[in-house]
Each structure stands twice: as structure tokens, then as C-alpha cells.
Amino acid sequence: MRVAALYDVHGNLPALEAVLAEVDAGTILVGGDAVLGPMPKETLALLRERDATFIRGNCDREVAAPGEGEELWTRRARWVHEQLDEEELAFLRGLPHPLSLEVEGLGEVLFCHGSPRSDEEILTAITPPKRLDPIFDGVTQDVVVCGHTHAQFDRLVGDRRLVNAGSVGMAYEGEPGIAAWALLGPTVELRRTPYDVEATVALVRETGFPDAEELVSEVLLHPPSAEEVTAHFESLAERQSL
């Protein structure tokens, strides 16, 4: 079985549609954070229509039970919560994390959002082995796929292969109009699918999504590079581990 790993869609329906038009795999694995974005209901419906397998991301938890603060992402989580009905929210609450699947040519692969032990732990292309070793303690799979940071990578950690599938809806690859994902089986392919970002921007502006212009300007039209994001997240992870 081949697996298309679609992570961090973040309610970007046009990007998702472009990727699904390319997917040729027996299983679609949604790696968390599918709905926290401007078109959540339509995104979730399309993925479920395609009979995708889901795991939980940190934003799925936040949407299912949003906080009361006024921070930007908290307000966005509340807005998405209000767009979904109770059945959809219950679906998000019931998502597993992590999940292992048998993949053609790769054996048993472990899919997680942040790390095998947490849906919000940060792993990057430059995370040092001293921090990775305890994270992988007890993990038996030779291939682990993660997301969360929106920046693709494929690296070896000892004998284990660690892959970040990137982000379908908010790819931090330094180029607008790119949806990043991974195709697994029998090898690992980091894929980048173009989509119409200008049309997406027009749709986003009509949704009522909180601070939509910030999303448009800072993510959709002018996304940071993988190098910038990796340095930022690794610095944050180092501070959190102290």
C-alpha cells in the first residue's frame, strides 16, 4: 500500500483540491491540523469524502475545545469551532495520535503530528540527536513521519528515517502557491504541488476568518523560507527544553 501523507491543510481548500488531483495512492493519511483555517467545513467534508485516515494535530484539539483568550490563534480556533457542527467536533475529539501503517517497501511507518510522544513537540531538520534520542525511546518503526512546522525535510537519525511531509495549506517553502506533501511507498517522495494562490486569496477574504489579511500577506503571498522557519522553531524548541 502506498500512502499520501497530507499534513497541515489548515482549511486551505484550493490547495487541498490541487493535491488530491495528483494523489495516486491507496491511502490518504491526514497528519493533523486539517481544519484550523479559512474553509474548515468544506476541507473536512472533502477529506472524509475521500475516505482519508486521520491523526490528531494540536490545532484539532484547540478547535474541538477552544480557549477564552484573545490571542490570534485562539480567536481563530473559536471561529472554526463555530463553523463546525457537533458531529464534526466529536470526530476531531476522537482522532488518534500517533498511528502506524504498513507501507509498501518501507514496512511499518509511524505517523505523528509533532513527535511520537506529543502532537505539538517540535522536530526540525537540524534538531540534534541529544534531543531526539529520548523522543524516540521505545519507537520500533524505522520510518517516522511528522509535520507541525510546515517545512519539509528527510533525514537520518542513526538508523531511523525522519520525514516531515510539509504543509498542504500553509507551506513554509519561501514560494507562494505551493502545497507540500509526501508520497510514501516504495520510496519517500517529498512532493510540491502548485495551486492558484490569487484565487485562494480572493476566497479567503470572503470567509470572515479572523485577521484574514495577516494570513494572506504573511503566509499565502509571502511565506517564509524553510531555513527561516527551521531556525525559528529550533530556537523555540531549545528554550522549551531548558
Regions found by a protein language model. Name each.
Residues 22-25, 103-105, 137-140, 183-185:
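Glycine-rich phosphate-binding loop signature in dinucleotide/nucleotide-binding domains
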Residues 70-75, 107-139:
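Active-site-proximal segments of metal-dependent phosphoesterases and phosphodiesterases across multiple
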Residues 156-242:
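Acidic, His/Gly-rich catalytic cores of divalent-metal-dependent hydrolytic chemistry
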Residues 129-168, 179-181:
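Anionic-ligand binding region
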Residues 1-4, 100-110, 157-161, 187-188:
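Beta-strand-turn-beta hairpins that frame and shape the catalytic cleft
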Residues 2-93:
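Core catalytic region of metal-dependent phosphoesterases/phosphodiesterases
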Residues 10-15, 36-39, 59-64, 119, ...:
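Active-site environment of divalent metal-dependent phosphoester hydrolases
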